[in-house]
Regions:
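Short beta->alpha connector loops at strand-helix junctions that form conserved
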Residues: 18, 61-62, 78-89, 181, ...
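Rossmann-like adenosine-cofactor binding region
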Residues: 45-48, 165-260
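NAD(P)-binding Rossmann-fold cofactor-contacting core
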Residues: 153-171
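Phosphate-binding beta-alpha-beta segment of Rossmann-like dinucleotide-binding domains, i.e.
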Residues: 76-78, 84-134, 146-149, 153
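Rossmann-like dinucleotide-binding domain for NAD(H)/NADP(H)
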Residues: 80-81, 215-310
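N-terminal glycine-/charge-rich "phosphate-binding" loop or analogous flexible N-terminal tail
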Residues: 1-34, 159, 168
C-alpha cells in the first residue's frame, strides 16, 4: 500500500477483497468502480472484465498469467502486467531440493520414523547417486537456466528442451539441447519449468510418460495444467515413474482429502510455495504495485512486464 500511495497519491482508495468462488458475485460488484486490480490466481475472463468498465490494468503478483483472458483484456483496453522476475533463484533452489529429497527417499524415511517409529535404512530401495544421473529440463527460460547452473556440480549431465529460445543459449549455459523424445528417453530426472500456453496443456500425459525409458523422477514446477493427473497417477501406480514432486496441481484449491497423490511415500507436494522466501515476497509485492503505478501514470515503458498491446 505504501508503494501505491506514494505513486498515486494519498487519496488512492485501496480495498483488499478475500476472494473465493462463493464470493464471485460480490467480487464483480467491487470491480465495477476499480481502476486497477492486483491478483495472483483469480480467473479474469471476459465476464469478469464486463463487470469492470473502469478497469485499466490487471497486475499479476506472479510470473504466470494464464488466469487472465488476454484477448478479452486487450479488446477492452486493459493492460495485463505479471511480475517476470522475482523468484528465479527460489524456484530453481526448490528444484534442487526436490531432486535430492526424492532421490534419497526422504519422504519414505520421514514417514517411517514419525509414524512407525522405525529405524531401518534398508527398508527403502537402493538409489543411484545424483552424480550418476542425467537431468532433463523442459522449459529453458530464466528459471530453467538457473536450475541448470545449480545442478552442474550434482549430476552427470544436463539436457534441455525449449523450442522458443535461441539455440545458442543451451551451450552458453553448459547444457546439451535435446529433442523432446531424446530428453524423455535419456533422463533419470525430469524437471518441468514451462509456462502454460495453448501448446502445452496436458503436455505430460500417458504418451509422454510411456517414452520415459529410465522410469525417472518427475518434478513439476511449472503449471499444474501441464500435467494430466490421471495419467500421472497411472504412471506412478505402474512404476513408470520412480517418484514425483510438485509445487503445483491441477487446481489451486485442490481437494487434498481425496486426492490420490496424497499419502504416497514417493510423492512430495508443496502448496505452490517454491517461490517463497523473505526476499521474493518483498520483491513480489513491490514490483506488482509499481506496475500499477507506472501504468496508471501513463509510464508504460517503466512497467516491468506488459504482456499485451494496449
Amino acid at each position: 500500500s505504501q508503494t501505491l500511495m506514494a505513486g498515486l497519491g494519498d487519496n488512492t482508495e485501496i480495498e483488499v477483497f478475500p476472494y473465493t468462488d462463493e464470493t464471485r458475485n460480490e467480487f464483480y460488484e467491487r470491480l465495477a468502480t476499480a481502476d486497477a486490480l492486483l491478483t495472483a490466481f483469480v480467473k479474469i475472463d471476459a465476464n469478469a472484465l464486463d463487470h469492470a468498465p473502469n478497469l485499466k490494468v490487471v497486475s499479476i503478483n506472479a510470473t504466470g498469467y494464464d488466469n487472465v483472458d488476454l484477448e478479452a483484456a486487450t479488446k477492452r483496453g486493459v493492460g495485463v502486467c505479471p511480475v517476470g522476475e522475482y523468484c528465479t533463484w527460489d524456484v530453481s533452489e526448490s528444484a534442487i531440493a526436490y531432486m535430492s529429497a526424492l532421490n534419497k527417499h526422504f519422504k519414505f524415511y520421514i514417514q517411517q520414523i514419525d509414524e512407525e517409529h522405525r529405524w531401518d535404512y534398508a527398508a527403502a530401495p537402493e538409489y543411484p547417486r545424483l552424480e550418476d544421473q542425467t537431468l532433463g529440463i523442459v522449459g529453458f527460460g530464466k528459471i530453467g537456466k538457473c536450475t541448470a547452473r545449480k545442478a552442474k556440480g550434482l549430476v552427470k549431465s544436463i539436457i534441455a528442451n525449449d523450442p522458443f529460445i535461441d539455440k545458442k543459449l543451451f551451450g552458453e549455459n553448459g547444457v546439451t539441447e535435446a529433442s523432446v523424445d531424446e530428453l524423455l528417453e535419456s533422463s533419470d530426472i525430469i524437471v518441468n519449468h514451462m509456462n502454460l500456453n495453448d501448446t502445452n496443456y496436458h503436455y505430460f500425459s500417458a504418451e509422454k510418460f510411456a517414452k520415459m525409458k529410465k522410469k525417472p523422477i518427475f518434478i513439476n514446477l511449472g503449471r499444474g495444467l501441464s500435467v494430466n493427473e490421471e495419467d500421472l497417477i497411472a504412471a506412478l501406480d505402474t512404476g513408470q515413474l520412480r517418484a514425483f514432486g510438485a509445487d503445483v496441481l491441477y487446481d489451486e484449491t485442490p481437494d487434498l482429502e481425496h486426492n490420490p497423490l496424497i499419502g504416497r511415500d514417493n510423492v512430495i507436494i508443496t502448496p505452490h510455495a517454491a517461490f517463497y522466501s523473505s526476499s521474493s515476497m518483498r520483491d513480489l509485492q513491490v514490483l506488482s504495485c509499481q506496475n500499477i503505478v507506472h501504468f496508471l501514470n501513463g509510464e508504460k515503458e517503466k512497467v516491468f512486464k506488459l504482456v499485451n498491446e494496449i
